[in-house]
Amino acid sequence: MTNRAWLLLLSAALSACAQKSAEEGAEPAPATVAAAAETAPTAQDGANGVAIWVHPQDGARSLILGAGGTGGLEVYGLDGALRQRIDDIEASHVTVRYGFDLGGRRIPLVLVFDPMRSQLFPYTIGDDGRLSRLSGTPVQADDDLVGLCSYTSPVSGRVYALGMTDGGQMLQWEYFTKGDAVEARLVRSVPVGKGAEYCVVDDASGTLYYGDEALGVMALPASVETDPARTVVDLAAPRGGLAAEVKGVGFVHGADGRPLVVVTDASAERFAIYGPEGGPIGRFQIGAGGAVDAVGESEGLAVAAVPMGEAYPEGILVVADQDNDGEHSNFKIVGWREARVAAGIADTAFAD
């Protein structure tokens, strides 16, 4: 699709959303849910991107992988306690792929972006729950990545990393093995405009969802064989249902199989959930509860709707909290059941 065609479509969408907003008027305040736990503060006050690794046998032993800026990658248990810190790199974004084929072994592949080096480093998670770096050449990005997600093609089984650059490009790398080393090659670059940041992919449909700080939430095909035509999920105010700054984006499948996209509506200090038809189907905010403070300024988020022990029978939502009451920022852990109930969403089921 040409830039002119895209702009014409976007203009039409903006006009339609503006008319809808004017007709609907002011919306009620979203329901509040309290975080069940919080992680230890980040070492260098850099809570940013976050990912969840689901333990294959025991969901209660799952891990939270938090990008802690200059403090490196910080690994937490579901109780929020720090289990491991990888501090020989800086970390701004992290993503996890399950079942990556390394010499005939299926392993979790963890990709971490180091903004100081502008490189993507590969790690895996051992049976003991510890992360270790894999051999191979780190990906050298041409620009700072302000968003990172990953995708496994349901057709070819190939694994990809997708990075949103500060310069307004979506870079897509295919990951593969050469002996015991993990390597990658750039397979495409798609202009998405400055402002595109956090992202997530629905593997089943091959749809990349990303937040654009100024525009709203957008989608485009993640498949390298498909024309990267963008579509609008929702727009920022005053033409859509989002505030002026969109940050983290997460994804789960509903119990009926429909995709649900969870978005950090940062300027409004709230979170929105979208269904396949577009437009928000639920909203909530994260308030104080017990010894855990409310979430204020937030950026990255991750969600996994799979049982994770008695405390989290439907999984968890994890969000970065730059306004943590402690000295440094941290990550808040919310039961997914509590979050979706607050948002008025029916039961959801994990699908990867």
Language-model features: locations:
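Positively charged n-region of N-terminal signal peptides that target proteins for export
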Residues: 1-5
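Bacterial N-terminal signal peptides
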Residues: 6-15
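Sequence/structural signature of beta-propeller domains
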Residues: 17-352
